[in-house]
A protein has these predicted regions:
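Charged catalytic cores and adjacent phosphate/nucleic-acid-binding surfaces used
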Residues: 2-92, 111-204, 211-215, 225, ...
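Beta-sheet-dominated interaction scaffolds and their linkers
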Residues: 89-111
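Glycine-centered loop/turn motifs
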Residues: 105, 242, 333-335, 365, ...
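An acidic-aromatic substrate-binding cleft motif
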Residues: 162-163, 236, 245-299, 615-631
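A short tyrosine-centered beta-strand micro-motif
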Residues: 218-222
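Asp/Glu-centered strand-loop micro-motifs enriched in Gly/Pro and often flanked by an aromatic residue
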Residues: 99-101, 207, 212, 268
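Catalytic cores of extracellular degradative/oxidative enzymes
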Residues: 262-456, 460, 465-468, 491
Length: 664
């Protein structure tokens, strides 16, 4: 049935004990198991009702204006089951979303959001309980209701629930898939034992095949997909009371990469990362299968204290494939090394326990911004892993300088990436993930233009233990790095070799094909000055509006999609000097893409003239500006035990400066 609970008896003892401890922590402190993230703890219950508005709410909470942000999210239509009770000098006003369905003999959760515009604290009675509300503040109250009776709120009656007869629904596809079942009031329905989760577009989702679930005997919408290589199949069904209805769907394939030797992976997935539910290995396996994801790296990582989530699972399995690995898919545990000032990076193929899992978190066992990330990069390399910096920047870097990447000190942006890449310690940069794709591309292009051979990769940073994110509760693999294995069977080692060689592309939907004189990403072409190189770029997938061929001097060729045909470029590029060439696809938001925009970017094909190195002085100066700002930020915000520690990190920056100055 694909929705059995995690089989603890098949887990290594330390992993089973870890899972049990997380269940206890989640019961004791939902959404913030370690007592280390007030923003997530406060925001998570609201996100259950505000859906995709959660991200804005969390950012506003960090800015200290939580009530105003919550109010900005209360636009019509309100979701089913949410009642907003507004208090001001004129009294109490209620407005509500549709009453949710409640199955006969069951219960359903509803919420009352108390929104006070009074200048003094007050109390309001909700379903017989007096609830304190701060002056000018908001308070969320939830209740489990069993019937249609009204919900008393401050002497008024709010709608509670609509009773509905029980029915059963059976779901089948040709393979494990991602499903969604919603009723005509927007309510979501899940099989017992499956973790309830919602994607970026606030659509409920679960994974499996041949599934059964209890549903109301009302009109239902069912969708089925299998990750970005597939379209979405949809149907409606109205099961009869007491009966069982069967739905069989098969999503159409948009493109197939494995047949061409390209395999898709997600290098940055958190199985457990605090949250409102606990994810077990079986849950993670179902998600990988249902997304058609060839490779998945589950990373252990801390948040802000000493606890490293999923550390026991990593240490019990380090260097070994997980139990559900086959010839068509592979999964491993690894580590995300985290310093919020210097940056975060992940390692694909890590074979052993590193000396440190994190640094620079005040209140943890590693409070100082030392040693430099460069030391951890070297250790990951010694332990067999690739090094990939993740979520590099959160702004578009649109002003021509790197200033926006230094606006917030501990923003988890990849400040040390520029130094570590110059020292040859980095293999890849995540162009897809919870970061700004345009700003990341700006940074990536400057690095390439200094001859740094970095692969384009993807690490989504999804948290499987969160029901709503919105990006963080997306399914794993919503963004992927596709690696050209050149006929080698799928394995972690083969995938890592492709990353090191730059035979990759990063995407959240479209699949790109780039050939320069018959050579693909990662390849090197020896050319003579003036030679004209034929270039073809193809693109498959949904939502692309513009296709570009780019190099160190900008856009070399472009086409806009139109007329229903797949966009393509057929051009010639003159080899005037050594260069890199990449293909890029862009588009606005699209229902099939689980992010704000459509984006794909290949790693480069390298064109070398008589072995001369690639040099673009303007990019070197831009990266030197980055390093200057990084050093200034260390001086102002770095935490060090002594001047020697600070000098060691600054020494890494100075080594990188010498490299970039060679190009000016």
């Amino acid at each position: 049935m694909c929705c059995d609970p995690p089989a603890a008896d098949r887990l290594p003892p330390q992993v089973a004990a870890m899972h049990e401890s997380y269940l206890a922590l989640a019961a004791e402190r939902p959404a913030d198991w370690g007592g280390e993230s007030d923003a997530y703890a406060a925001g998570q219950p609201y996100g259950r009702w505000l859906g995709v508005r959660l991200l804005a709410a969390v950012f506003s909470l960090q800015a200290g204006d939580w009530p105003a942000t919550v109010r900005s999210c209360l636009t019509e239509p309100l979701p089913a089951g949410l009642v907003v009770a507004s208090l001001d000098d004129g009294g109490l006003r209620l407005r509500a979303g549709p009453a949710p369905y409640v199955l006969e003999g069951g219960s359903v959760e509803v919420a009352v959001l108390l929104d006070s515009h009074l200048e003094q604290a007050t109390r309001l009675e909700v379903d017989g309980t007096s609830v304190p509300v701060p002056a000018g503040g908001v308070e969320l109250v939830t209740r489990a209701v069993t019937g249609a009776g009204p919900l008393p709120v401050g002497g008024a009656d709010a709608p509670a629930a609509q009773p509905a007869a029980r029915a059963r629904l059976r779901l089948r596809a040709a393979a494990p898939s991602r499903w969604s079942v919603t009723d005509d009031r927007g309510g979501a329905w899940f099989p017992a034992g499956c973790l309830p989760r919602w994607d970026f577009h606030d659509r409920p989702l679960f994974h499996g095949n041949d599934l059964e679930l209890e549903v109301p005997a009302v009109p239902l919408t069912v969708t089925c997909t299998r990750g970005m290589e597939f379209a979405t199949a949809e149907t409606t069904v109205t099961p009869s009371a007491g009966d069982s209805a069967e739905v069989e769907l098969e999503p159409a394939r948009l493109y197939e990469t494995a047949a061409r030797g390209w395999y898709g992976g997600d290098l940055h997935v958190h199985m457990n990362y605090s949250g409102d539910q606990v994810c077990g290995p079986d849950d993670a396996a179902r998600m990988q299968l249902g997304e058609g994801l060839h490779l998945m790296t589950l990373v252990a990582g801390n948040i802000g204290r000493t606890r490293v989530y999923d550390r026991e699972a990593f240490e019990a399995t380090a260097g070994h494939d997980l139990a559900w690995t086959t010839g068509e898919r592979v999964a491993r545990f690894s580590v995300e090394f985290r310093n919020d000032l210097l940056g975060h990076f992940h390692g694909l193929g890590l074979t052993g326990r590193p000396a440190r899992y994190h640094s620079g978190h005040d209140g943890s066992d590693e409070p100082h911004d030392w040693p430099p990330n460069a030391d951890a990069c070297r250790e990951f390399r010694r332990l067999g892993a690739t090094v990939g910096y993740t979520h590099p920047v959160f702004s578009p870097l649109s002003d021509g300088t790197p200033a926006q990447a230094f606006a917030v000190p501990r923003s988890v942006e990849a400040r040390e990436l520029v130094a570590d890449a110059a020292l040859g310690l980095v293999d890849s940069v995540d162009l897809i993930g919870p970061s700004d794709v345009e700003g990341t591309a700006v940074l990536y292009h400057h690095l390439l233009s200094c001859g740094l051979r970095l692969a384009a990769t993807a690490g989504t940073d999804v948290w499987l233990s969160y029901s709503r994110g919105p990006l963080f509760s997306n399914p794993p693999g919503w963004g992927r790095v596709y690696a050209d294995l050149r006929g080698t069977p799928l394995s972690v080692a083969a995938f890592a070799d492709a990353v090191r060689a730059g035979r990759t592309q990063a995407t959240n939907g479209p699949f790109l094909e780039l050939l320069v004189d018959g050579r693909g990403p990662g390849d090197r072409i020896e050319a003579t000055p003036g030679r004209r190189l034929p270039v073809t770029v193809g693109c498959q997938g949904l939502g692309v509006e513009r296709l570009e061929l780019v190099g160190p001097d900008g856009v070399l060729a472009a086409t806009d999609a139109g007329g229903g045909a797949a966009p393509a470029i057929d051009a010639e590029v003159e080899a005037g000097e050594s260069m890199w060439l990449c293909a890029v696809a862009r588009g606005p938001g699209h229902p099939s893409v689980l992010g704000p925009v459509v984006f794909a970017h290949t790693s480069p094909v390298w064109v070398e003239l008589h072995g001369r190195p690639l040099r673009r002085p303007a990019s070197a100066r831009w990266l030197l500006d980055w390093l200057d700002r990084f050093e200034a930020m260390l001086g102002q915000h770095g935490r060090f035990a002594d001047d020697g520690q600070r000098a060691e990190v600054v020494g890494v920056i100075e080594q990188a400066r010498r490299r970039y100055r060679e190009f000016c």
